[in-house]
Amino acid sequence: MPGASFPETEDGLIWDMLTELPERLKREESCLGGIMPKRIYLAGWSQSGSLMITYTNYFAKADFEAGRKPVYDGWFSAGPAPACAPALNQSECMDAEAGDNKIRFAGVPYLEMHTESENAFLGTAAAKIDDSDDPQLQYRFYTIAGATHDAKSTMRDYYHDDRSDQDKVGVFFVYPGKEPYPNDFPYGMAYCAGLKCLYDWVEKGMEPPKVEDVSVNADLTNQKDEHGNALGGWRLPEIELPVCTYQQFSTPLVKSESGALYGSEIPFSVEKLKGLYQDVTHYRRLVEEKADEAIGKRLLLPEDREACVEHAVAKAIKYGLEGGC
């Protein structure tokens, strides 16, 4: 795959690994020390999520046609890049326009969650399929409004106190944008809620919520509301009660494609914040109400309510909202 592997290589080894690992984990002499897993899920982020497209279409389907039990009980694909989905036994990516990288088989529940970044830049729009309850293609698709593929939390905060892993591989995540504020939307909370929805789907037969997708224009850019934020999608309080415009991109200081994935925030003026929310006390009350609504819709875990509220309020204070506590 361009930028990710050498042209003379292909991804055969990973298919073996993805197939053999769950089988080994289910053996009594496995590396889990005799603990037998009740269920095994496969989760992938970004390019790893794109590999799941190839794996489900070919290997999971082959198991089904041969009468074998599924090796996984559920699929969780987060921020996948369909444009990077490799063709079987080849180094080249599959043809998005021809629909080769569309999910055609799952066998067990498959939940796919995107940020706003992937629509045009990573081929999601061309590969998207409709939600399905077909027994062989139980599938849900979501886009987290306000979120971008790369964000402050995943690219900076997680490594704040320990950069040893980055040192080992010589890769350092630096915000590339001219805009002063990188995207700091708390999309991890949405992913946690989505994963819980998948667990409930597999273990309890409880179907995930239906969520209207982010609306897009003809050029695949996302349609915006009066604040410049996305319409539709998986919505957390910070997009329902915004204090900034969440841009899908940042403007690189030097020529680079990294800004297409690393979003930015444009704060509202203090006057606009006061006009919308009065003061911090009133804003907190509104966020708490929206958090409870999101929990009721299964878009936010009850365990994340406090963190969700505090994150939103802290950002409002950061961008100039005052008054109360």
Where are these regions (language model features)?
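C-terminal His-loop and adjacent cap/lid subdomain of alpha/beta-hydrolase
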Residues: 1-325
